[in-house]
Amino acid sequence: MLTMGLSIVSLARFQFAMTTVFHFFFVPFSIGMGFLVAIMETIYAVKKDKVYLDMAKFWGKIFLLSFAVGIVTGIIQEFQFGMNWSEYSRFMGDVFGAPLAIEALLAFFIESVFIGIWMFTWDRFKPGVHAFMIWMTSIGTMLSAIWILAANSFMQHPTGFRINNATGRIQLTDFGAVVANPQLWKVFPHVILAAFMTAGVVIAGMSAWGLLRKKSGENHFFKTSLRFGLWASLIFALASAGAGDLQTQQIIKDQPMKFAATEGIYEDTKDPAPWTVVELIDSKNHTASGKIELPGVLSLLAYHKLSGSVKGMNTINKELHAKYDKKFGKDMNYYVPPKTLFWSFRVMTGIDALIMLVAFVGLIFSRKKKDTIESHKWMLVVLGICLWVPFIANSAGWFITEFGRYPWIVYGLFTIADAVSPTSTVGTLLFSNIVYFLLFTLLGGVMIWYCRQTLHHGPYFEEADAKQNVDPFAKEAFGQ
């Protein structure tokens, strides 16, 4: 039974990870793309430069598909909550339901209404009014993110609640405290700025492939899009790194075990604390060896000063046992997965640095006065390949957030093992995992195929096709 129970928990966790990671491919992408398309259309409304109108229409197609796929994957994610985590839903429903209800009734309503108007009214409003529609859509996507992150931030740092001893459930006592949760206002800027960066990298990467095609009449469009995407990539990669630093300060305060794991620290560091570039982690014996360190750098990163030591996981584990043993027992394992967090952090920050470097070099090569980017095919290929890397960085950041909360599903209140549905079985979880994986593969394939087809047809395909359309009731429609 113990093995069966562990298998059920592992399979349920895998399904949650799979559905959330895949959903998170599209959420930052659609948020960022909507924002950048709004900027494009605003530039057109102000400058009347038609290339920005063409850009808004072309990249708007990519935004619409990512938005649609994000909705589908979000529905699947909510469905598996009820199927696999009913005890969690029962425990957290009073708190979790409020932000989700507001997200659906307010934010998603705004998105749905204005995205529909924006899609079908290109020639019915003045440019400024039409740009307002996509701005409202973009604001709606960001409002959705706030409410979802409010629920997740409660799971990381619970506020504004009490435990009903009769039912054993959380009850919401202060909605304002949930909204004002310091975790929320540290994680939200980091996520949103990373979303803008993601869209910028994708625009730059797809534009690079467009330039490599050398299709007549498209050079100006794709070069303008390329520089737009590169500027967005550079600016928002820098801003996202700064927001991530602020989030780190909150993690040190609320979840020291998570921070220690991201830095691979088992024993308390000396003062000042060195930053470990790479190391060999022995999670079984709770030790690390083969370290390559930069003296004093971790103190600067953690405390913004050249002094201060950092607690190790072994010390923090003892403190958590002293705090929670009376409630959860002495057999609890408070160590988070150190290898996952250590390398996820380095992948995330490494990719962010790579994007800054590539965007900076790309901007140099694509300067207006020196038309050299087309002659450096290697640079265009690098940019084209890099369009995938922000999705890896976003997933790595999600791994840090979720794996770093282990063994809690609601920090300090409810464990992952207690949250699984009592009716879940290995068979049903295996079946649903396979079905979801196949469905996600199909959705991902459709998204990639559509983006490729859109790029292949180019920005002026729709206009050329529209000229051939006729009134379905005109005589031309009947071949006369």
Spell out what each predicted region is.
Residues 2-480:
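Polytopic transmembrane helical bundles with strong interfacial aromatic enrichment
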